[in-house]
Amino acid sequence: MLFTKTIKRMTIAAAIVATIPALAAAAGGNPDLYADSSKVVPVTELKFYQDKEGLTVANGWGDPASGAHSNYIKMPGGTASGVHTHTYSYYGVVIAGVVANELPGSKQDHPLPAGSYWYQKGGEQHVTKCISQTECIFFVTSKGAFDYLPAR
């Protein structure tokens, strides 16, 4: 009896787990995020472009205009964004250069060399800076669409 109940529970659990990918696809799940096979993209194949906010961007996975995504972003050395927010929170990982991501009015920058990361809460004003003299490249990932909302 106990064995039969255990088998039934395992069968139900397996059916639920097997259904999750289909539900994600039906809900508009991201095919790159849950691809059927692995994907390899050398840095030489990244296609950088200027987005509508003027950022130099290459798409990682997903669609930054509509939902979950990752992007590579380039900033020239010694430059800073204006004070701005994003609707959705994100994580940033520094690939090249030295970045600082600070709240407005911060008294000093907290240098983030290559390999460092930061978390930016959605709706919180901040300034992103490339504080090295050389170009900065960082990888950003978010569960929501990308936007850049200048502070007023």
Give the ranges of each region predicted by the language model.
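Short acidic-glycine-tyrosine-enriched beta hairpin
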Residues: 106-123
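Conserved short histidine dyad/triad with adjacent acidic residue
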Residues: 69-86, 121-123
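A short, N-terminal "cap"/entry segment at the start of jelly-roll beta-barrel domains
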Residues: 25-69, 152
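Short beta-strand His + acidic residue motifs that chelate non-heme Fe in jelly-roll/DSBH
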Residues: 81-83, 101-102, 120, 125-131
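Ligand-binding loop in jelly-roll beta-barrel domains
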Residues: 122-146
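Bacterial N-terminal signal peptides
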Residues: 11-22
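Glycine- and acidic-residue-biased ligand/ion/polar-headgroup-sensing regions
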Residues: 76-78, 86-105
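Bacterial N-terminal signal peptides that target proteins for export
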Residues: 2-12
